[in-house]
Amino acid sequence: MHPAEVFDYEDIQLVPNKCIIDSRSEADTSIEFGPRRFKIPVVPANMETVINEPLAVWLAEHDYFYVMHRFQPEDRRGFIERMQAKSLFASISVGVKPEEVTFIDELATAGLTPEYITIDIAHGHSDAVIRMIHHIKQQLPNSFVIAGNVGTPEAVRELENAGADATKVGIGPGKACITKLKTGFGTGGWQLAAVRLCAKAARKPIVADGGIRYNGDIAKSIRFGASMVMIGSMLAGHEQSPGSLLTIDGRTFKQYWGSASEKQKGAYRNVEGKQMLVPYRGDIDQTLTAMEEDLQSAISYAGGRNLLDIRTVDYVIVKSSILNGDNY
């Protein structure tokens, strides 16, 4: 890999084109992803501190994509039934352990097909994930399967060839993830370059997962080939977010933790996520609307009308992280 190809979100600036719309409200931020079209290319991370059932219902009702977490496995079947009873799409997560294979069999026997299934493990380029893709496609052929997480073009090709309908890219770039520190592996610090390399190899959609700090990073993800952007910490801490409010020195926070943290595992085993407090951010509707409006502005700067027009713009590598002495 050539060193010039290694960059992250803060190292890139997109180059403006002549604007062809009179108002940013004319810009269309929607994206087709699987069998549906969504308002913006953003999905809250499938983490216990980011998504729960009431929020999943709200998101589905308002044309946003969601992926329910997999940390209450006994309730997943009921969740699918309740969502479909409301005429809403069901989008769940599974792992790769034997009981997950059994769960897929149970869904098939019951005639329950969730529209979206995300196979979600920390190191998704594995034989276990490939076997799980095969199994889901055999038992639930109409489910749209997102597989991950991966960080290389080879992984994307293998998972797509196994039958994945989309792949999720990102090994430890997230704020609550310390995989890069504990193992020495990951896409932390070059997540955007990893998205670019993976998207170039992909024939199917890419989900950029992790490392998003600002709304402009969503546009950068789209520019480098992502169709959907998964966001954790920026979509935690809202009124609708799971977790209790804490007030410290007059400031209000909510708890947030990574997907394999001690808090979640309940015991100290292979911990690759950390606990933190995020500032209370009010209503999630306002945050998502701001993301949509900033994307509309990005489309206007790109000289386009539609989201994917962002893919054609030039970019410069500014390496601000080096200039500023940032080392995360």
UniProtKB/Swiss-Prot annotation:
Function text: Catalyzes the irreversible NADPH-dependent deamination of GMP to IMP. It functions in the conversion of nucleobase, nucleoside and nucleotide derivatives of G to A nucleotides, and in maintaining the intracellular balance of A and G nucleotides.
Classification lineage: Bacteria, Bacillati, Bacillota, Bacilli, Lactobacillales
UniProt binding sites for NADP(+): 206-229
Reactions mediated catalytically: IMP + NH4(+) + NADP(+) = GMP + NADPH + 2 H(+)
Organism listed in the record: Levilactobacillus brevis (strain ATCC 367 / BCRC 12310 / CIP 105137 / JCM 1170 / LMG 11437 / NCIMB 947 / NCTC 947)
Cited Gene3D superfamilies: Aldolase class I (3.20.20.70)
Protein name: GMP reductase
PROSITE patterns the UniProt entry points to: IMP_DH_GMP_RED
InterPro entries: Aldolase_TIM, GMP_reductase, GuaC_type_2, IMP_DH/GMP_Rdtase_CS, IMP_DH_GMPRt
